[in-house]
Amino acid sequence: MKKAVKVTALSLALAFTSSLAMATENIAFISGDYLFQNHPDRKMVAEKLESEFKARVEKLTANKKSIDEKIAASQKKVEAKVAALQKDAPKLRSADIKKREEEINKLGNSEQEAINKLVTAHDEEVSKYQDDYAKREREETAKLVDSIQNAVNTVAREKNYTLVLNEGAVVFAADAKNITEDVLKVIPATQAK
């Protein structure tokens, strides 16, 4: 019985202390996605990346157009040989027809091989471009995220918050605990530092 009383007393003491500790916690939340989407520098960063990679995009687009033109020209060349053979076939011996068919097949294979090399080289350039763009985008995103984090820290310190959570981790919170707009207002000042 004495053990039960001690356990009960200890449980009440712990519950009372933890509720006091919780009462001193000042917790807020933010919408990280909203802050990122509405970051003052986000549009400028997108334009900067577009400008930085514009020449490469134009070069890749021109290269793709050139390849498409070469494919069309190659098909026309082979089709012209086939049409000529069909036109001349009634006048030719079967050995001559077979020889011209082999020439057409050889030409078609040669053209296809040349096109495949061009397409492979183009695909490698596209892949390299995509990797480079993704790397730069990650670098710029990290800068935006850092500025958001700095703004969150600034607002949390100013308003004496001991804990700031992202809204995805919050099941319920009063709207007064949402400091997203306060953080958004601080971001440009944080960028200027």
UniProtKB/Swiss-Prot annotation:
Its main location: membrane. SUPFAM superfamilies: OmpH-like. GO terms for cellular component: cell outer membrane; cytosol. SMART domains: OmpH. GO terms for molecular function: unfolded protein binding. GO terms for biological process: chaperone-mediated protein folding; protein stabilization. Residues 1-23 form the signal peptide. Gene3D superfamilies: Skp domain. It holds the Pfam family OmpH. It is found in: Cell outer membrane. It comes from the Bacteria. Keywords: Cell outer membrane, Membrane, Signal. Belongs to the Skp family. This is Outer membrane p25. It comes from Pasteurella multocida (strain Pm70).
